[in-house]
């Protein structure tokens, strides 16, 4: 119903919903965690690609942590603070970010059978019961 929709939408707008993504990166990260703060805007000459732009980009922040390294690839958690288009993909691949694209990212890295980025967990306040609710689903990689 409309009231439920508005209550859920409000949580997204206020950025109170907690999101956790898991990604497999094409390389080895030395650091264990951090925050990436790179403003993004659309690449007008190459849509839908996004690019880092300090002059005209919108703020984009991503918290991340390393889970494990295996077969010259790094499994990480991403916790987006903002929610820009392609934010996690650009923050992973960009030279000022992690410099390590997501496996299967044909826009910012190299092609594979799939993009190895998965929304693993979503936590929010139930609009009716007011209880904190977490929905999780494991990645298949």
Language model features with spans:
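RNA pseudouridine synthases
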Residues: 1-141
């Amino acid at each position: 119903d409309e009231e439920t929709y508005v209550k859920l939408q409000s949580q997204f707008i206020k950025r109170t919903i907690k999101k956790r993504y898991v990604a497999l990166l094409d390389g080895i990260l030395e650091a264990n965690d951090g925050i990436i703060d790179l403003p993004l805007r659309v690449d007008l000459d190459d849509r839908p690609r996004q690019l880092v732009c300090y002059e005209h980009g919108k703020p984009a922040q991503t918290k991340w942590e390393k889970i494990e390294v295996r077969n010259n690839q790094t499994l990480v958690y991403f916790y987006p603070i903002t929610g820009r288009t392609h934010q996690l993909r650009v923050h992973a691949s960009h030279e000022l970010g992690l410099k390590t694209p997501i496996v299967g990212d044909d826009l910012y890295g190299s092609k594979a059978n799939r993009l190895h980025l998965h929304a693993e967990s979503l936590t929010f306040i139930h609009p009716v019961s007011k209880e904190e609710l977490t929905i999780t689903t494991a990645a298949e990689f």
